[in-house]
Every structure is written in C-alpha cells, then in structure tokens.
From Swiss-Prot:
Lineage: Bacteria, Bacillati, Bacillota, Bacilli, Bacillales
Keywords: ATP-binding, Cell membrane, Membrane, Nucleotide-binding, Translocase, Transport
Keyword Cell division: no
Matches recorded under SMART domains: AAA
Family, as annotated: Belongs to the ABC transporter superfamily. Aliphatic sulfonates importer (TC 3.A.1.17.2) family.
The encoding gene: ssuB3
Signal peptide boundaries: none
The protein, known as: Aliphatic sulfonates import ATP-binding protein SsuB 3
Record localization: Cell membrane
Recorded GO CC terms: plasma membrane
Membrane topology reported for the UniProt record: Peripheral membrane protein
Gene3D superfamilies assigned to the protein according to its UniProt record, in alphabetical order: P-loop containing nucleotide triphosphate hydrolases
Subunit text: The complex is composed of two ATP-binding proteins (SsuB), two transmembrane proteins (SsuC) and a solute-binding protein (SsuA).
Residue ranges of domain ABC transporter in the record: 14-235
Gene Ontology molecular function: any one: ATP hydrolysis activity
Organism: Shouchella clausii (strain KSM-K16)
C-alpha cells in the first residue's frame, strides 16, 4: 500500500515553542511547547473545548498564532515547503464529481494514474468511476484518505475522522491508517475524543486541558495492537482517569 516512490523517511519534525492563541478575550491555547519527531504518530486527546482542534488548525496553518513559534524541520511552514494534508469527520466529497475526480481535486497535470494507485491503497480500486452518493460512510472516508495520500504528505492531520463511523468500520479504518502510516513514514497528528483509538494508533498521547498540556505519555506497546491487551487497557485507563480528574 505504499503510495510514494521514496524509501527514506519523509515525515516532518514539528517544534512548537510558547504557542498561544486568543479569540477576543479568550485564551484558547496557553503557552504550549513540544517537539514532535519526524515520522512519529501523535494523538491529541481532551474534552470538548480544551483547545485540541485549535492546536491542530494552528499546526496546519489554518489559523495564525497570537504568539509563539511553529517550525517544520527548523523552518516556518512556508519556507519548509512541507506537504500537509488533512482529514476531517466529514469526508467533504463533491457529490457532482466521480470518486477519482474527488481524489485528484485541485491537482494539475497527469495525476490519474497516481489517483488510481491511492484508491488501490485504500481498497477502492473498483469504485473509481462511482458517484460519492453510492458509497457508505466508511468508503467515503477512504476516498478522503486517498485524497490526502495523493499529495504524498510529510504531515497527515486527522481531526476526528472516524468519529461518525460504526464500531466495525472504525476499527477497519484504524488498521488501514496505521498500515499506510507505517509504509509511508509521514508524521501523523490525530485529534480524537476516543482514548482507546489514541492508544491503539499513537506512539505518544498528549492530553490538552484548558489550553495547556496536562499529560504527555509515550506508548511503548508493539504493533499491531490488540484492544483487549492488558497493557493497552491499563494505558487507556491511565489517560482516561487523568481526563476525568476535574469532573
């Protein structure tokens, strides 16, 4: 399922220093400092309104910080020329375009062969010329993943992309994302409310609480991870109990 010809690690290192973001008089992100290694899979968890999605948008360049620094391989986003793509809870497919055209949306030149390749990588080779309306929710998210992969990301941002899916489809998508990440070695940054999902997928789990980092824990478990594994359950309990402390 590897979608790039490169064999060397291409994930981008992210350095965040004293990052702050205010909206009016509300300080949503408060002095966050952290480093994410190139090729690392990091999950950001926390309650609604904690600032985790705002942090994701800042890293993606969709919002500008009020203060602080964001560096990608030691340079600003623009100067680094890092390829950053995003997946959302909503697949955001255009209903009047075929699946293959949704995958290549905005691309120029001869991208069709590459489009077919990434559709194969996500298990949708047979659906290239279908309309989005004929696909299930899980299949639509696979198209969204293919659309992200065709751009050969250095950083893949995942903003609750699986939260609307049923349990079985969600598990299948988790396995697919993990496999593609392992084969293509980009940096992955996942925002999720699901602590089990974070523990299953991530090398590192970061808890954001009221705009600050409340917990930053490494995940030592080998892959692939079984959600019934005792150590996984214990790590899930550790993170969940910390989230619930202030309730």
């Amino acid at each position: 399922m590897a979608i790039a010809k490169q064999t060397t690690k291409r994930g981008v290192e992210i350095r965040i220093a004293q990052l702050q973001k205010t909206f009016g008089d509300q300080n949503v992100i408060k002095d966050i400092t952290l480093t994410i290694e190139a090729g690392q899979f990091v999950a950001i968890v926390g309650k609604s309104g904690s600032g985790k999605s705002t942090l994701l948008r800042l890293v993606a360049g969709l919002e500008q910080p009020s203060s602080g620094d964001l560096l990608f391989n030691g340079a600003t986003l623009k100067k680094s020329q890092a390829s950053i793509t995003m997946m959302y809870q909503d697949s955001r497919l255009l209903p009047w375009k075929k699946v293959i055209d949704n995958v290549g949306l905005g691309l120029k030149g001869n991208w069709q062969q590459k489009g077919e390749s990434v559709l194969h990588a996500v298990g949708l080779s047979a659906f290239s010329n279908e309309w989005p309306s004929t696909l299930s929710g899980g299949q639509q998210q696979r198209v969204a993943l293919a659309r992200a992969l065709i751009r050969e990301p250095d950083l893949l941002m995942l903003d609750e992309p699986l939260s609307a899916l049923d349990a079985l489809t969600r598990s299948e998508m988790q396995d697919l994302i993990e496999t593609i990440w392992q084969e293509n070695q980009f940096t992955a940054l996942l925002v999720t409310h699901d602590v089990r999902e974070a523990v299953k997928l991530a090398d590192r789990i970061i808890l954001i609480e009221e705009g600050v980092i409340a917990l930053d824990v490494e995940n030592p478990l080998s892959r692939p991870r079984d959600v019934t594994n005792k150590q996984l359950i214990e790590l899930e309990k550790q993170v969940t109990s910390r989230i619930l402390e202030k309730e």
